[in-house]
Amino acid sequence: MRKQILFVLFSLATLSIHADEGMWMLTDLKAQNTVAMRELGLEIPIEEVYNANGLSLKDAVVHFGGGCTGEVISSEGLVLTNHHCGYGAIQQHSNVEHDYLTDGFWAMNRDAELPTPGLTVTFIDRILDVTDYVNEQLKKDPDPDGVNYLSPNYLGNVAERFAKAENIEITPATKLELKAFYGGNKYYLFIKTVYSDIRMVGAPPSSIGKFGADTDNWMWPRHTGDFSLFRIYADKNGKPAEYSKDNVPLQVKKHLKISLAGVQEGDFTFVMGFPGRNWRYMIADEVEERMQTTNFMRQHVRGARQKVLMEQMLKDPAVRIHYASKYASSANYWKNAIGMNEGLIRLNVLDTKRAQQEELLARGREKGDDSYQKAFDEIRSIVSHRRDALYHQQAINEALVTALDFMRIPSTTELVTALKSKDKELIKEAKLKLKKEGDKYFASVPFPDVERMVAKEMLKTYANYIPAEQRINIFEIINSRFKGSIDAFVDACFEHSIFGNPKNFEKFIKKPSLYKIGYDWMVLFKYSVTDGILKTAIAMKEANQNYDAAHKVWVKGMMDMRQEKGMPIYPDANSTLRLTYGQVLSYEPADGVVYDAHTTLKGVMEKEDQGNWEFVVPQKLKELYKSQDYGRYGKNGEMPVCFIVNTDNTGGNSGSPVFNSKGQLVGTAFDRNFEGLTGDIAFRPSSQRAACVDIRYTLFIIDKYAGASHIIDELSIE
C-alpha cells in the first residue's frame, strides 16, 4: 500500500507540470497550442480538431439550451449532454403519473421521442476575428458616452453590417453574435445555426443521473451517471424548423466516434465546450469583494431557502417534482460559493493576485508607462465605492427576487391606466389581459403554502443582513402596520392580496378598483423590491462609470506581460466555444489523502443508503452489479463510472465532450472538484480537476440497464 501511495505521489509530481491553464480560442490553437498538445500526446492533426475551411470535431459540439454543452453522437442528430443540463426538460415532461425524474425515460422508437418546447441546440458554423473591422467602425460611429466598444446592441449592429459587407448568407435560423474579448481589446464574430425542434430521447432515473445529489455536488470521488439524450429534428430538407410531426431527424455533417478503450492515469485528453464566466484578470480587491458580497449572499440566502424547500419536497412527490429544477439550480451555485471562498483562503489567492499586480505595476514603472498604475488605482477606487451597493443588490436579488415566485405576479399598470381613463372598452381589454396573466401565474405556483413558508424565511434572512435604515421601504409598512412581524405581513399577503389566492383574484377581476390595487400588500411589496433594485442599480452604475475603460487597460497590460514571457494568452470565459486540454490525473487534496483518477460501480454500492434519497440505488443496477453483467463496457471485472482530468473547465462546460488523443469520445464533463472551485478566479493545477462520466458507463446504462440497444446501434463505437 505504501508503495502504491508513493508511486501515485511521484506521478503527481512529474505529471502536474503538464497541467495547462487556459480556455483556448479555437482560432488560436494552431499558432499557440499545437506544440504543447502534441507533447502531451495529441495524435491527430490539429485541423481535425478545428478547421476554419472544413469539417472538424468542432462541428459536432453544440451549445445546448444556451447554458450547457452537448455533442452529436450519431449521424441522425442524437445529442449527448448531462442529466442536469436536461433536468428542466425531464421535469417538464414529468408528473405524478409519469415521474421521469424518479423512474427515468427511454424512447423505444422515434415516435416516442418527446418534443421539448423552448429547448434549442446551436451549431457554430464559423468563427471570425473581426477586431480590425470593429475598431474601424468604432472610430467612425458617434459614441458620446464611450460605451460602444462593449455594447451588445452596438456590436449586434456591427455584426449585421459586417455580414452584409462580406455577403454572408443569413437564414431565419442564422444567429450572429459579435463579442468583445480581453476587455474590448479583441473581437470575434460567431455565425451560428439554431435548431428549435429538440426531442427528449433518454434519461436515467435521478438515482443514477443525480446520484449523490447535493452531498456529492462539486466533490470527488463521484459515482454519478450524469447524462441525458436528445435528438435534433429538422424539416424534410434538413433545415431548422419549429416543431412539426412532419419533421425528421437531422442528418448531421459530423458526429463523434466513441472509444471503449477508456483512459488511464496520465493519458492526454481535451475538452470542447461553452464555458460561461470566469474572472482571471481581477485584481485582489475584486476577489475580496466577490468573497464578501456575491459568494457570501449565495451561501447564506440560498442555504436558508433550500432548507425550507427540501423539508417540503420530502413530504410530497408533487411538491418534489414542481420544485426539483429550481432547487437543483439554486443548490448548484450555493455549494460553488462555499467551495470557492474556502479555496481562495486555503490557496492564498489574494497574495498571489497581489504579487501578479505588483509585477505588472513594476513593469509599467520600468517602461515609464503610468497607464497600468492609473487603471489599477481607478479599479481599487471603484471597488471601494460600490461595495455597500453591491452587497445590498446581492441581498435583494438572492432573497427577494430569485427566491420568491410571487415577485412574478402580473403587472397591474395597464389596468390602472384603463381605470383612470374610465373607458369601458379599455377596462374590459385590460381585465381580460390581466385575467389571462393571472391564471398563468397561479398555474405556476400550485403550492401556495410552500411559497408562504419560503417568503417568511427570505424576508427574515434579508432583514438579518441589511441594517434597518437601509432596507427596502416595505419594511416601514411591516413595522407600522404589522408591529414588525414578517410572518403577519406574509400571511396578510396570501390571505388578503389580489394575487394571494385564486379566489381573491377572481373577486377582484369582477370588480377592480384603483383603491384595491393601491393598497394591495403583494403589489406594494413588488413595487418596493423594484424600487430597491433601481436604487442599487443606479448606485452601481455611478460607481462603475469608469470601470470598463480601466479594466481594458489592465487586461491589455496582463496580455502584453504574458506574451513578453513567451506565454500563450486566452480571454476570460464568456459562453463562447473554447478548448482546454490536460491529462487524466489523480490528486492529493490534503496531507495523507490521495484521490484516484477513476471510480467504479463498486463505489456506487458502497455509497448506497436506501434511507437517504441522495444515495438510493435502483434494484436493477444492483442486480447487474451482483451478476457483473457489464457486457463490453466493463474492464477487468469492474464497471468504470467516472474519471477526472486536469483541464480548465467552468460552468457552461457541463455536457462537454472529453476526447482522447485520437479525437474519440471517452467521456462527458459534468462537474468540478471542491478543491478546484477557485478556478473561476485563479487556476491551480495541483488541485483543479474536472469530473467526467466515463462513456462506457453511459453506454452500459443505456444498453444493459435501460435495454435501449436500438440507441447503441446508431452510434459509431470503435
Task: Identify what each model region corresponds to.
Residues 2, 16-718:
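Terminal presequence/propeptide segments associated with secretion/organelle targeting
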Residues 4-13:
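Sec-dependent N-terminal signal peptides
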